[in-house]
Amino acid sequence: MPKLSLPAEAALAAAGAAAAGIAGSATALRSPAVMRRLNDWASRRLTDAQRADRYAAILPTPLSGPGFYADPIDLTGLVNGDVIRVERVSPRIAVPGISIRRFMVASTDTAGNPVPVTATLVEPRRPWRGSGPRPVVVRNQPINSLGLKAAPSHRIGRGVFIDMPPFLPLLLARNYAVLLPDHEGPRMAYSAGVMAAHAVLDSVRGMTRIAPELAESPTVMDGYSGGAIATVWAAQEQPHYAPELRFAGAVAGGTPTDYALLHRSMNGAWGAGLFAAATIGQAREYPEMVELFGDFAFHLATLVKDYPQPPLAAAGLARIDLDVLAVIPEPFESPIAQAVVGANKPGASAPQMPVLLYHGSRSKLLGDQFIPEEGVTELVARWRDGGATVEYRAVPGEHMIAAGAAMPGVLRWMRDTLEAER
């Protein structure tokens, strides 16, 4: 697909309506007659290959060319965490005083099938002067994207990696090692909890193989928003998926925990673009979801399948109600959707590591406008009922302000938690 300017990318959510001669407004899309015209318009634009395999058509475009990401990747005989390949990375914009390695390991997807996952290990060159081995922070960056070029391992080598919230430079300044998993997995399954957990935990396993001096390091996980999905699921899955791994704790903020809540707060509102992207991401792990896509929705999915976060978020300006794009009324209430929602709601089992959860709260100021606080407070209660040690902090601000407001406290919690392991 040709490279588009950001305004052009952001406008693509309404491009089909414009091409059909219909105003691309949320109100217009609720008309059955309008949707029939849009579906007819989109159907004529689908290729034979897209019609033949609708699931394959929404998968991200593979990264082409020889090198680290090249196929074929033979997983025969490998166990989770086995290293497939590793290479040193020299970013286009040099960062003095650090060493960067990206690596690929064997893992499993949501259905238990073998898949490769990738991660990046960033280490200060300065010797660790503290007691014991150098601490490690597993930094689950909010990727919130659908294309493989948005994965941290790919972006960091091109000097375009952006940390949000900006913890990475602060962690490196403390002389910690930082592991950046590509937690959306090989299909960029944005928001799929089990896939994210496996990617994170197998990345940690792989890290201990390529850097054995870190195998006994005190380790914490961290993530915000989309990265918090990976963090809470990795914390929950660790006792039975990777029981040999030890973590001092996990901290997550702005955590989406319940897609029933997100359906009410984001669908048809300013968050509709990212909610739509998360729907596509889930469909990549649950192929049966594609059955719910009308032709117009499916055609849009094929157009945005490689998009990074900014244009996906900007598409929320259209405030499209995804329900009207489905082939059935009230698709969110369908057995397919409800099964996926249930499978991606954490809380069924409790982590064994201490956990800090924080969230923008109306009780402090504003409150998170996209991700309702009640979802995370329910998770706190469920995990505590399961015997977990969970601290909850309500912080001031909406979704973005809360991330920054919590940074000092989160950094202190990380420091204290890592030091308690010595």
State what each model feature region is.
Residues 15, 19-118, 123-126, 384:
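Catalytic-loop region of hydrolases
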Residues 362-390:
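Active-site-adjacent alpha-helix of alpha/beta-hydrolase-fold enzymes
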Residues 351, 357-364:
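Short beta-strand/loop motif that positions the catalytic acidic residue
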Residues 38-74, 255-350, 367-370, 376:
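Accessory cap/linker subdomain of secreted extracellular hydrolases
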Residues 109-173, 182-184, 368-370:
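Short, surface-exposed "cap/lid" segments of acyl-processing enzymes
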Residues 386-422:
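Catalytic active-site module of serine/aspartate enzymes centered on a nucleophile-bearing elbow/loop
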Residues 205-273:
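Primarily recognizes the serine-hydrolase "nucleophile elbow" in alpha/beta-hydrolase
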Residues 163-167, 190-213:
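Alpha/beta-hydrolase active-site loop
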